[in-house]
Amino acid sequence: MSGYDRMLRTLGGNLMEFIENLDALHSYLALSYQEMNAPSFRVERGADGKMFLHYYSDRSGLCHIVPGIIEAVAKDFFDIDVIMDILDMNEEVERTGKKEHVVFLIVQKAHRKMRKTKPKRLQDSQGMERDQEALQAAFLKMKEKYLNVSACPVKKSHWDVVRSIVMFGKGHLMNTFEPIYPERLWIEEKTFCNAFPFHIVFDESLQVKQARVNIQKYVPGLQTQNIQLDEYFSIIHPQVTFNIFSIRRFINSQFVLKTRREMMPVAWQSRTTLKLQGQMIWMESMWCMVYLCSPKLRSLQELEELNMHLSDIAPNDTTRDLILLNQQRLAEIELSNQLERKKEELQVLSKHLAIEKKKTETLLYAMLPKHVANQLREGKKVAAGEFKSCTILFSDVVTFTNICTACEPIQIVNVLNSMYSKFDRLTSVHAVYKVETIGDAYMVVGGVPVPIGNHAQRVANFALGMRISAKEVTNPVTGEPIQLRVGIHTGPVLADVVGDKMPRYCLFGDTVNTASRMESHGLPNKVHLSPTAYRALKNQGFKIIERGEIEVKGKGRMTTYFLIQNLNATEDEIMGRSKTPVDHKGSTQKASLPTTKLQGSVQPSCPEHSSLASWLL
């Protein structure tokens, strides 16, 4: 029952009380489900004891499910079997429009437990009669023994009540309750008014006969004798016409009345209108209706808007507790909302932190090898690494000093930025590590920090790509393409992280010095190879020519070489450009590249270089 099982079971002690309180439950649920259009139920007991159920609804055609629901409730909640028949069905015009009005007759079947214990033989019936006579005799004996009527006189009618509670009637326990009413009302008029500070008494013509002082305080018009109640109030709930007939039809509903603003004093026009919520009770002997009510308030703010105080509400009225508890609930809700807002702000800050952290990691990985950067982030000390074989490349711009002299600084920055962006892309294509850049000098190493066997081929392909990329960068002085000198050497190095505030991954050893000498002794637009670099690239698909023996500063005479091209790869493949040829049907498809062209290339980290993934050795 969606969690409402306990609430439904506590609505009433019998079927009639259950149905009478359904409207109150619907009023409560309407606070949470404001779009709910609930029906209304009214029970009427006839003079012959028959029960009539009046069903009202804005939605026609749903009355046929009512018998099944009521019969199920009677059987499940009260262990009785009932049947329902439709006596009358019509439409009535109310304030909110037409309502379907259906009258059901509810008839109780024989009790299920009685059917199970029905006597089957004559002797069983006679035995039950003997048991009843014995119980009657025992009751009289207990009465004479324990209760002295002369010492404690009790009315005979009271003994009838006691007997009805404990005696068996017709074979089953009587579960009826007969209240005892006083012969006179032991309460003064003033005391009654103080106990119920908000109440109104009116007759069948809606003429006000009595109104408590607290209501007169907030509705001054009630001080006038014999005024009409509907002139100062309108019915908010239930949605019925304001007359005694409609009120009596929905006597078991909770009534909400609202003051009419036009009847309030002019000085009060800006105030919130007063709403009263309570119960209508018909006084048959006086032919009047009493409305026992309380202000419909939920918070201290609403109390202040009405210029009202808690002292205006009776101490026994739960409206006081409702206001204070709801105020505490509102404070808790506000605190919860603040926490929710802080949570959302924290989530936004966490996203910004993640973005900044990503930027920091990107910058750190640009300065240091990834595995070295991870060790530093974890607070670990990075040990120096010795690499027995690697290939180092140096490059610089020819006549760079002259270019700097003839150009503005911003032009130099733009030239270097354009050139280095192309070179950085090539490092991803050929999976080599950029060590550093100083001015126009660019240093790359293969086989460090991760040892690989084909480091020389990787660096050679990178050098050829540098030479091609340089043709796309214009010399701002001459207007011609930039010219590079490139030197490559293969040998052992020592690698370590140097510095704390600005750590750098540095290479040490004679291999670094020799590679630098190959660059400085090279020629424009040539890739200069040392003897060890030549031996590493020999028979690997590269076109290499011998330069001859030259004097190298600090090294003496050396036979060096020039790298011309990769015989197994095109320029696009060297540059890592994707190729998408058009087939004979006009659709584009990826080129199928041979697997043996670029010696030593690996799968690049950038998506645009994915065409090199098939060139692995």
Curated annotation (Swiss-Prot):
<dbReference type="GO" id="GO:0008074">
    <property type="term" value="C:guanylate cyclase complex, soluble"/>
</dbReference>
<keyword id="KW-0479">Metal-binding</keyword>
<dbReference type="InterPro" id="IPR011645">
    <property type="entry name" value="HNOB_dom_associated"/>
</dbReference>
<dbReference type="GO" id="GO:0020037">
    <property type="term" value="F:heme binding"/>
</dbReference>
<feature type="region of interest" description="Disordered">
    <location>
        <begin position="577"/>
        <end position="605"/>
    </location>
</feature>
<dbReference type="InterPro" id="IPR001054">
    <property type="entry name" value="A/G_cyclase"/>
</dbReference>
<keyword id="KW-0547">Nucleotide-binding</keyword>
<dbReference type="GO" id="GO:0070482">
    <property type="term" value="P:response to oxygen levels"/>
</dbReference>
<dbReference type="InterPro" id="IPR042463">
    <property type="entry name" value="HNOB_dom_associated_sf"/>
</dbReference>
<keyword id="KW-0456">Lyase</keyword>
<dbReference type="Pfam" id="PF07700">
    <property type="entry name" value="HNOB"/>
</dbReference>
<dbReference type="GO" id="GO:0005525">
    <property type="term" value="F:GTP binding"/>
</dbReference>
<feature type="compositionally biased region" description="Basic and acidic residues">
    <location>
        <begin position="577"/>
        <end position="586"/>
    </location>
</feature>
<dbReference type="GO" id="GO:0004383">
    <property type="term" value="F:guanylate cyclase activity"/>
</dbReference>
<keyword id="KW-0342">GTP-binding</keyword>
<keyword id="KW-0408">Iron</keyword>
<feature type="domain" description="Guanylate cyclase">
    <location>
        <begin position="391"/>
        <end position="519"/>
    </location>
</feature>
<dbReference type="InterPro" id="IPR029787">
    <property type="entry name" value="Nucleotide_cyclase"/>
</dbReference>
<protein>
    <recommendedName>
        <fullName>Guanylate cyclase soluble subunit beta-2</fullName>
        <ecNumber>4.6.1.2</ecNumber>
    </recommendedName>
</protein>
<keyword id="KW-0141">cGMP biosynthesis</keyword>
<keyword id="KW-0963">Cytoplasm</keyword>
<comment type="similarity">
    <text>Belongs to the adenylyl cyclase class-4/guanylyl cyclase family.</text>
</comment>
<keyword id="KW-0349">Heme</keyword>
<comment type="subunit">
    <text>Heterodimer of an alpha and a beta chain.</text>
</comment>
<dbReference type="Pfam" id="PF07701">
    <property type="entry name" value="HNOBA"/>
</dbReference>
<dbReference type="InterPro" id="IPR018297">
    <property type="entry name" value="A/G_cyclase_CS"/>
</dbReference>
<feature type="compositionally biased region" description="Polar residues">
    <location>
        <begin position="588"/>
        <end position="604"/>
    </location>
</feature>
<dbReference type="InterPro" id="IPR038158">
    <property type="entry name" value="H-NOX_domain_sf"/>
</dbReference>
<dbReference type="GO" id="GO:0005829">
    <property type="term" value="C:cytosol"/>
</dbReference>
<dbReference type="InterPro" id="IPR024096">
    <property type="entry name" value="NO_sig/Golgi_transp_ligand-bd"/>
</dbReference>
<dbReference type="GO" id="GO:0019934">
    <property type="term" value="P:cGMP-mediated signaling"/>
</dbReference>
<feature type="binding site" description="proximal binding residue">
    <location>
        <position position="26"/>
    </location>
    <ligand>
        <name>heme</name>
    </ligand>
</feature>
<dbReference type="GO" id="GO:0046872">
    <property type="term" value="F:metal ion binding"/>
</dbReference>
<dbReference type="InterPro" id="IPR011644">
    <property type="entry name" value="Heme_NO-bd"/>
</dbReference>
<dbReference type="Pfam" id="PF00211">
    <property type="entry name" value="Guanylate_cyc"/>
</dbReference>
